[in-house]
From Swiss-Prot:
Ca(2+) 2 binds at D57, D59, N61, T63, E68. It comes from Homo sapiens. Ca(2+) 4 binds at D130, D132, D134, Q136, E141. The keyword Nuclease does not apply. It holds the Pfam family EF-hand_7. The gene is CALML3. Keywords: Calcium, Metal-binding, Repeat. Expressed in normal mammary, prostate, cervical, and epidermal tissues. It is greatly reduced or undetectable in transformed cells. May function as a specific light chain of unconventional myosin-10 (MYO10), also enhances MYO10 translation, possibly by acting as a chaperone for the emerging MYO10 heavy chain protein. May compete with calmodulin by binding, with different affinities, to cellular substrates. This is Calmodulin-like protein 3. Interacts with MYO10, the interaction is calcium-dependent and essential for MYO10 function in filopodial extension. Induction: By TGFB1.
């Protein structure tokens, strides 16, 4: 996984890691992990940090060495890429940029993709995704549909 990072990314991660490795022993504490990740443009929640630590701190000593950190950051970067792809897909459907996909917008995009859908089929797609019942699909609903596939 870490081999998918560029040399520049590895260098950037090493610099950030070193900033928080106060005593130079090659390890940072779990508390410092969130600070390091935020300095690299990630925004992990407390729950995500706990999950990451339990995943990478195999010996349970409360510290993370650089190879463990690098593997975790590679996974996190991959997740971020996937999220950006989903946001981009949503923007394709959300023609007017109002944060919602209407039946008309869905029909327009599907037609451009070569899918000739009946009004009933488009309405059914909207109904299936529209969990709050407002007649259109917001970003959270859009993600839920994509992730459930």
């Amino acid at each position: 996984m870490a081999d998918q990072l560029t040399e520049e990314q590895v260098t950037e991660f090493k610099e950030a890691f070193s900033l928080f490795d106060k005593d130079g022993d090659g390890c940072i504490t779990t508390r410092e992990l969130g600070t390091v990740m935020r300095s690299l443009g990630q925004n992990p929640t407390e729950a995500e940090l706990r999950d990451m630590m339990s995943e990478i701190d195999r010996d349970g000593n409360g510290t993370v060495d650089f190879p463990e950190f690098l593997g975790m950051m590679a996974r996190k970067m991959k997740d971020t890429d996937n999220e950006e792809e989903i946001r981009e897909a949503f923007r394709v459907f959300d023609k007017d940029g109002n944060g919602f996909v209407s039946a008309a917008e869905l029909r327009h995009v599907m037609t451009r993709l070569g899918e000739k859908l009946s009004d009933e089929e488009v309405d059914e797609m909207i109904r299936a995704a529209d969990t709050d019942g407002d007649g259109q699909v917001n970003y959270e609903e859009f993600v839920r549909v994509l992730v459930s596939k």
